[in-house]
């Protein structure tokens, strides 16, 4: 099943989207918002699934042509947004870039930070930035949305609470990160609002691509119209989504609508190297910080700048038949405040 949120008020209006993303139908009579649906998932899911089947068969009353520009992030705001960092190659590169050591517990204890969830960006909203000097970066990721998760669940139990999957652009201000982390209290100013794909899908919608709590498909990223990366999301993810959810719930409950991220999707070279740009025959990257560090390693100097005002990033995922699964994150960086 595929769900989305029309821009309407602070929490939007829930709609159901056809498998090919061409049509949609309202679901407000079943649940007014996605948050409401998640809070009563077991009760409303059968009705949503029935209408989804009707939509795909062409028999849903009130169906309309879908315009992705009318969509907010599936949850325009959430009670919880916690982002992991489950890809070893990304962790190694960004830590090397700021001369930080790998944590000894990386292989057994996930990295995770708590982000701002009070006002997510829509997938086609501008990324407003105060200054280019802050080091504006995109991060292509995957995230899951849960229902109510009890405290201290096991990964096996956590898997049952994962209801939806979506993509993320976790915007980062790289120039602010070292100073903030040096204080020993984590990210804050360095992590402005994130955006999410216009469509959230149930795990079964991914078919065989959803295995062991991971999405086994490439994440496609374009920067200013040029392919920047297409790393595989599955094989190099050290911790699965059930493990990340269990980690987040180790000492606390997670309320329905909690969003848990994978961290930046990243692949090393087959020989263990840090990866190559698309132009050099590699799978590329899902963020600028990685390519900058690789340039430093390979060429002795950084060639790629961080994002500037007017730059545009596009993040998508396609199935093996070339069909867009989640819709498209398509954002331009603009100066704040606007003139």
Report each predicted region and the residues it spans.
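A beta-strand-loop signature enriched in Asp, Gly, Thr, and Trp
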Residues: 211-263, 267-280
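Short, charged beta-turn/beta-strand-edge "cap" motif at the junction between a beta-strand
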Residues: 9-11, 88, 149-151, 261, ...
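Active-site microenvironments in enzyme catalytic cores
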Residues: 1-8, 19, 38-231, 238-243, ...
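Short beta-strand-centered aromatic/proline hotspots
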Residues: 15
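Active-site pocket scaffolds in enzymes
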Residues: 260-309
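Structural signal for terminal/edge beta-strands and the immediately following C-terminal loop/tail
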Residues: 313-339
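Short, surface-exposed secondary-structure edge patches
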Residues: 78, 133, 250-252, 303-306
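Residue-level recognition of short, solvent-exposed, well-ordered loop/turn junctions
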Residues: 82, 255, 308-309
């Amino acid at each position: 099943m595929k769900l989305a949120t029309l821009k309407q008020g602070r929490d939007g209006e829930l709609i159901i989207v056809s498998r090919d993303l061409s049509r949609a139908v309202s679901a407000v009579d079943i649940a007014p918002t996605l948050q409401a649906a998640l809070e009563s998932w077991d009760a409303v899911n059968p009705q949503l699934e029935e209408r989804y089947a009707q939509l795909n068969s062409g028999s849903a009353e009130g169906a309309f042509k879908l315009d992705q520009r009318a969509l907010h992030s599936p949850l325009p705001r959430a009670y919880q947004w916690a982002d992991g960092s489950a890809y070893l190659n990304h962790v190694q590169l960004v830590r090397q870039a700021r001369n930080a050591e790998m944590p000894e517990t990386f292989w057994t204890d996930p990295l995770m930070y708590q982000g701002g969830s009070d006002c997510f960006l829509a997938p086609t909203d501008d990324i407003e930035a105060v200054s280019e000097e802050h080091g504006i970066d995109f991060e292509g990721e995957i995230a899951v949305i849960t229902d109510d998760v009890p405290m201290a669940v096991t990964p096996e139990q956590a898997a049952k609470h994962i209801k939806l999957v979506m993509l993320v652009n976790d915007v980062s201000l790289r120039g602010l990160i070292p100073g903030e982390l040096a204080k020993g209290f984590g990210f804050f100013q360095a992590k402005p609002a994130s955006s999410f794909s216009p469509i959230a899908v149930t795990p079964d919608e991914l078919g065989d691509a959803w295995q062991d709590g991971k999405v086994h498909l490439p994440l496609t990223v374009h920067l200013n119209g040029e392919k920047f990366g297409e790393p595989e999301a599955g094989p190099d993810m050290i911790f699965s989504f059930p493990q990340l959810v269990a980690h987040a719930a180790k000492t606390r409950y997670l309320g329905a609508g909690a969003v848990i991220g994978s961290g930046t999707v990243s692949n090393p070279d087959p020989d263990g190297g840090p990866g190559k740009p698309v132009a050099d025959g590699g799978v590329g990257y899902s963020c600028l910080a990685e390519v900058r560090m690789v340039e430093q390693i390979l060429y002795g100097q950084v060639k790629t700048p961080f994002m500037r005002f007017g730059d545009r990033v596009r993040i998508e995922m396609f199935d093996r038949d070339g069909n867009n699964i989640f819709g498209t994150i398509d954002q331009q960086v603009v100066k704040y405040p606007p003139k």
